A protein has these predicted regions:
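Long, contiguous binding/interaction regions
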Residues: 1-258
Length: 258
């Protein structure tokens, strides 16, 4: 992380990811601009704005109903258009605790409530809105609340593969061989890892060593699984790999259709 100097009009990198997390025991669907991580906090953008839009209907978990989601997507689109009209950096959003929360950073918070709430009320008068302003020079909300931990980051990567499969009409509930790639510092730790996962039905299908790399030993392990279960599977392998000083690098799957 480093501090970056910016003019009024700055070009912001974008790489959006979505994942589930729990905050205060409640589930949150979190969408975050991952690309901000390396340059944040942005110099001068020290005020964090949180804009809440309260659902009209929600599930017991505090998430919106499937029926209300399309209306919330329209509100999201309207918010993005309003954000283009001010000097602000969009950090992300959370659907959590019966409300949709937008988070963005500005240099000057004056006039933001009128800009966003008044305009959104005109377009979507049936909703209740609230806006908070907090000084957050270090962008703690971005780093500690919006940005994913290692499990959330793996979920984002998983979703990218799952979405690619769905584009080819994959049936995610159908069993298929799934290949996982992992890296270790030496043959010994790779061997101990393999001994552990083989007890869970995995088998090694490829192995190579690339001298000069920090983790030179690559192993590919495979097992027949359901793609819909991939989050739990990858989180488990990630933990085991890290316990041996290794790195879980990802997975691939053939397309499985009915």
């Amino acid at each position: 992380m480093n501090t970056q100097n910016n003019s009024t009009h700055i070009e912001i990198p974008e790489n959006w990811g979505m994942y589930m997390q729990r905050i205060d025991g409640k589930p949150s669907v979190t969408r975050v601009n991952l690309a901000l991580y390396d340059s944040a906090p942005y110099s001068g953008y020290q005020y964090r704005i949180q804009l809440a839009v309260y659902y009209k209907n929600q599930t017991e978990s505090g998430l919106p109903t499937a029926e209300e989601n399309p209306q919330l997507w329209e509100i999201e689109d309207a918010f993005v258009e309003l954000l283009k009209q001010v000097d602000a950096i969009d950090a992300g959003l959370m659907k959590w605790n019966n409300r949709l929360n937008f988070f963005f950073y500005v240099k000057k918070p004056e006039g933001m409530e009128a800009k966003f709430i008044d305009n959104l009320k005109q377009q979507f008068p049936d909703y209740e809105y609230k806006l908070w302003v907090d000084e957050d020079k270090a962008w703690e909300c971005y780093f500690e609340t919006l940005y994913p931990d290692k499990y959330g980051m793996q979920e984002i990567k998983n979703n990218q593969v799952l979405n690619a499969l769905l584009k080819h009409n994959d049936n995610l509930e159908k069993e298929r061989q799934i290949d996982h790639y992992l890296f270790f510092k030496d043959e010994e730790t790779a061997h101990f890892f393999l001994e552990t996962v083989e007890k869970e039905g995995f088998k090694e299908t490829a192995h190579r060593t690339d001298e000069g790399e920090e983790l030179p030993v690559m192993t590919c392990i495979s097992r027949v699984d359901i793609a819909d279960d991939i989050h739990d599977i990858t989180w488990h392998l990630l933990d085991i790999a890290e316990s041996f000083g290794g790195d879980y690098d990802g997975w691939e799957s053939p397309i499985a259709t009915d």
